[in-house]
Structures are given as C-alpha cells and as structure tokens.
Amino acid sequence: MHELSIARSVVDICTENAGGRRVCSVTIEIGALSGVATESIRFCFDACTRGTLLENALLLIEHVPASGRCRQCNSEFPVKACYDPCPACGGVGMDLITGEELRVKGLTVV
C-alpha cells in the first residue's frame, strides 16, 4: 500500500510549510490515472496525522479527470484508460495532459 508513504509525504510537506502553526485543512489533487486509492489515502492520512500539527485536520481531495492529446490529429479528449483511441480520428498514440496529478494544492493554518 503506497498510500501510507504518500500520506506521510503530505504530512511532511504540510508540516514544513505550516510555520509551526496548527493545520486545519489540507487540499490535495489526485488524478484519475494516478493509481492512488482515495479511501486508503484518507485512512492513512488520519493515522499519520496523530500527534502532529495536522491532527484532526480535514483532508479535502480534488479529483482530476484524465485528458489526452492525439499525436496524429492534435485533438484533446477525455481519457478513461491510457490505451483509449482518439474519438476524432481513431489514432492510438496520445500524450496525457491531465490525470496523473498527485500534489498538495493548499493548506489552511491557524
């Protein structure tokens, strides 16, 4: 379960940026193709924040849908899986634009 190490990293990032103040909420972005299980992150976050500046902090998760750009016709389209063909031309080569995100977007401190 790599969500535990991700949750630890989120706590570390927030602690470094909180300036010694208590953190009330943390907002993270998780892309649809990131491979991160939202419920596991929530569970691990709660466990990792005990006894820290983030204890009892609210974890807000923003889901980022996947989108891609066709290498053949340059069309942008929503992606459900990395091997989806382009709906405009049927091409199979694409570059992901969004969907792999995993980042701390912001935090609220007191």
UniProtKB/Swiss-Prot annotation:
Pfam families for the chain: HypA
Residues noted as binding Zn(2+) in the record, renumbered to the chain: C70, C73, C86, C89
GO biological process terms, semicolon-separated: protein maturation; protein modification process
Top-level taxon: Bacteria
Residues binding Ni(2+): H2
Keywords, ordered alphabetically: Metal-binding, Nickel, Zinc
A single GO molecular function term of this UniProt record: nickel cation binding
GTP-binding as UniProt keyword: no
PANTHER family with a match to the protein in the record: HYDROGENASE MATURATION FACTOR HYPA (PTHR34535:SF3)
Family stated for the protein in its record: Belongs to the HypA/HybF family.
Described function: Involved in the maturation of [NiFe] hydrogenases. Required for nickel insertion into the metal center of the hydrogenase.
Protein name per Swiss-Prot or TrEMBL: Hydrogenase maturation factor HypA
Species per Swiss-Prot/TrEMBL record: Geotalea daltonii (strain DSM 22248 / JCM 15807 / FRC-32) (Geobacter daltonii)
